[in-house]
């Protein structure tokens, strides 16, 4: 079975990468479009500068270099596809490789800040009252 070709609003990835930023902005949802029309913030420009630096660089193991950033409000653009970003979630850098399907999303959507809590069974040390629970 043939592999489905990715299209964003009717355009292939190659067509999107050839477009100017203004043309791509017009294809994005309204919230992202308004944000990008105001221009990039300094921290967002820093992410774009880091991308240019590591464009063709690889680390010792042959994997692409991870671009670490705290900027969770950066919008994924077509020229970011294929890069690996370390997005900070408040505790650690979550490695995310940008796929074509992520275009138009925010970085923060891919690095969750809250995890699901799975509480343990009550026992010694769980609470102050558990000191009086008999040991098994």
Curated annotation (Swiss-Prot):
The keyword Protein transport does not apply. Pfam families: Ribosomal_S19. One of its GO terms (biological process) is translation. GO terms for molecular function: rRNA binding; structural constituent of ribosome. PROSITE patterns: RIBOSOMAL_S19 (PS00323). It comes from the Archaea. InterPro entries: Ribosomal_uS19, Ribosomal_uS19_CS, Ribosomal_uS19_euk/arc, Ribosomal_uS19_SF. Keywords: Ribonucleoprotein, Ribosomal protein, RNA-binding, rRNA-binding. GO terms for cellular component: cytosolic small ribosomal subunit. Protein S19 forms a complex with S13 that binds strongly to the 16S ribosomal RNA. NCBIfam families: PRK04038.1, uS19_arch. Belongs to the universal ribosomal protein uS19 family. This is Small ribosomal subunit protein uS19. It comes from Methanosphaera stadtmanae (strain ATCC 43021 / DSM 3091 / JCM 11832 / MCB-3).
């Amino acid at each position: 079975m043939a592999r489905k070709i990715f299209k964003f609003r009717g355009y292939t990835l190659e067509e999107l990468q050839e477009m100017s930023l203004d043309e791509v902005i017009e294809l994005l949802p309204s919230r992202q479009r308004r944000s990008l029309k105001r221009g990039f913030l300094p921290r967002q420009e820093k992410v774009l500068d880091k991308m240019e630096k590591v464009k063709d660089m690889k680390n010792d193991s042959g994997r692409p270099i991870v671009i670490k950033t705290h900027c969770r409000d950066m919008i994924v653009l077509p020229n970011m596809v294929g890069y690996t970003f370390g997005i900070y979630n408040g505790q650690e850098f979550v490695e995310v490789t940008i796929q074509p399907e992520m275009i138009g999303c925010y970085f923060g959507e891919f690095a969750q800040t809250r995890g699901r809590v799975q509480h343990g069974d009550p026992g010694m040390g769980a609470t102050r009252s558990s000191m009086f629970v008999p040991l098994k």
